[in-house]
């Protein structure tokens, strides 16, 4: 079943990512909506072309109760560059013909042509997962192992799955209401000795929100 397909045309689409977590109190979910634009770029040196994406959105949050929140950030945990964002994750999950041509993939998804939606994200393509010990303190960000949520949140807590699907809903905003420091350059700046371990960027630019 395809939900929300063929709504945009061209080479742009929006998708919702939903994170499902099993807890002793039942399944908890959190989701966020993102926009993707695929386009072709020219290589000045070689004269050839390549493809890229314009991606907008913010981290998905799963409230696990007791002040505990799981964040699914905007980059894939196993990504090798800043280009490995959730736009690429969505293409890999929903477009069986994805071959790293981002514009063509965006066109197929926008048209609902040969895609799978909803689709489960493969564990190797999961986003970077973190939790925040103190919502007012960026140095308290801690990486979470998707295969062992219990280590961060206690017994009986397990990542069930991550699902993406095409949608016509608006892009999610408002993460700054939970993380007041996120758009404050002075509060967000972290000295090297206090930088959280396992987090690619010490100032979190582009990890929690594309608005920085």
Which residues fall in each region the model found?
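Short consensus segments that form the blades of beta-propeller domains
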Residues: 8-9, 50
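Alpha-helical transmembrane signal-anchor/signal-peptide segments
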Residues: 10-23
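Glycine-rich, aromatic-bearing surface loops/beta-hairpins
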Residues: 133-212
């Amino acid at each position: 079943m395809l939900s929300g397909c063929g709504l945009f045309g061209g080479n742009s689409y929006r998708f919702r990512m939903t994170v499902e977590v099993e807890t002793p109190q039942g399944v908890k979910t959190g989701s966020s909506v993102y926009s993707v634009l695929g386009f072709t770029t020219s290589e000045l040196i070689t004269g050839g072309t390549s493809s890229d994406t314009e991606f907008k959105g913010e981290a998905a949050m799963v409230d696990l109760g007791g002040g505990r929140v799981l964040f699914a950030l905007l980059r894939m945990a196993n990504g090798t560059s800043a280009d490995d964002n959730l736009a690429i994750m969505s293409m890999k999950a929903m477009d069986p013909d994805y071959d790293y041509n981002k514009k063509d993939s965006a066109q197929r998804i926008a048209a609902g042509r040969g895609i799978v939606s909803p689709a489960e994200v493969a564990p190797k393509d999961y986003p970077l997962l973190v939790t925040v010990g103190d919502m007012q303190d960026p140095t308290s960000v801690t990486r979470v192992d998707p295969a062992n949520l219990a280590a961060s949140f206690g017994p009986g807590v397990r990542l069930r799955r991550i699902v993406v699907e095409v949608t016509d809903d608006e892009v999610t905003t408002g993460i700054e209401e939970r993380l007041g420091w996120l758009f404050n350059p002075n509060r967000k700046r972290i000295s090297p000795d206090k930088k959280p371990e396992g987090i690619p960027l010490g100032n979190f630019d582009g990890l929690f929100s594309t608005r920085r």
